Amino acid sequence: MTLQLTNEWDKVFEKSDKVNHKKVSFKNHFGIEIAADLYIPKERNDKLPAIAITGPYGAVKEQSSGLYAQTLAERGFLALAFDPSFTGESGGGTRYMTSPDLNVEDFQAAIDYLSNLDEADSNKLAIIGICGWGGMALQTACLETRIKAVISSTMYDMTRIAGNGYFDADNNKGARKNARKAINNQRTEDYKNGEYKLAGGVVDPVPDDAPEFLQDYHAYYKTPRGYHKRSLNSNGGWTIQTNGSLANTRILTYANEIDMPVLIIHGEKAHSRYNSETAFDMITGETKTNGVTPEPYTGVYPLGNTKVGNKELYIVEGASHVDLYDNLDKIPFRKIETFLKTNFEV
C-alpha cells in the first residue's frame, strides 16, 4: 500500500528557518511502511550524527517527537521523527495496535534507514524515546548494537503500567485476571462486530477533580497547543484489546546488559517518575527504589544528574510529565546535545 503523506507543514510547532525538512518512508521487517519526517541542518559540511525519535505513546510525529527532532537539527544533528506502525501516516492494516516486539522493530527499522542514508554518519547513531516510547527505546538498546547512545525522556514502562496499573496498584493475580477477562471478552465482541473498539483518547472534558497529570494531558492533546487530527491521544485512542499484548510481556529483562551510554530524563514533579528511577536501577544494578511505588511518588534520586558508569539519570527541577513534551524551558536540550556529542566524540 502506498502511503498518503501530507506535504504541507501541519506540525503543532513552528517551522525552523535553520533546518531543511522532508517526508520520507522506509519498511520494517514485517513489511510495514513507516512514515517519517527528516530534519537536516541547512548549514553542514559532512555526514552528520543521526538520531531516530518517536513518542509519546499515542502521539504522532507532528507533535513532540517532531519538536525534539527539529530542535536537535538546529543543534547540528540529523534527526528522524517517525510514526510507529499502525499509527499516524504509517502503514499497517489494523489501525491503533501496538506490541513491544513491533515497537522495537520500528526503532530498528529506523536505524536500518539511517545506516544507509548518504547524509548520515552510520558510526554515530542514537535513538530517543518519549513517554511510553522511552521504555521501548531502552528495550531496543538491549538488542541493537549499531547505536552509540540511547535517551529516554519522561518515560513510561508501558508493559508495567498495563500489567500492574498506575503505581503498581493492581499488581496482583486477581486484578490481572479480571483485566484479561475484559480484554478477551472485547476480542469476542470485536470479531462479532467486524471492527476493533477504541479505548478513547484523553478524556474531554476533563473532570474538575481529575488528577493533575490528566489535566496536563488534556492541556496538551485536546487544545491547540498540541492537538493533531492523526494523534490517537487527541482523538479515539488505542484499540482496547491491544493492552493484552502489553500486559503479557515485560520489557527490560536484559536492561543490565545495556553497555552503551544511557541518558534517562524525567521531571521532578512527574507522576510517572518511578518508571525512570526503577529503570535506572535495573540497568545500573542499584536498589534505591526497591520496587516500591507509593502514591504520590516523590522520587529517591536527587535533582540534576546522577551518573553510574555509563548510565545517567537526569531529574529536571519543577518539571511535570507533559512539560517534557514541548516546554522548551524544561526540556534539557543542552544536556541532550552535550551527552550525544560527548558519546559521538563530535
Annotated model-derived regions:
Residues 97-118:
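Alpha/beta-hydrolase active-site loop
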Residues 47-56:
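Short beta-strand element of the alpha/beta-hydrolase
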Residues 71-91:
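Conserved alpha/beta-hydrolase
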Residues 258, 264-266:
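Short beta-strand/loop motif that positions the catalytic acidic residue
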Residues 3-46:
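N-terminal cap/lid segment of alpha/beta-hydrolase-fold proteins
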Residues 138-223:
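Alpha/beta-hydrolase-fold enzymes
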Residues 58-70, 84:
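The serine-hydrolase catalytic nucleophile loop
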Residues 319-329:
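Catalytic histidine-centered segment of alpha/beta-hydrolase-like enzymes
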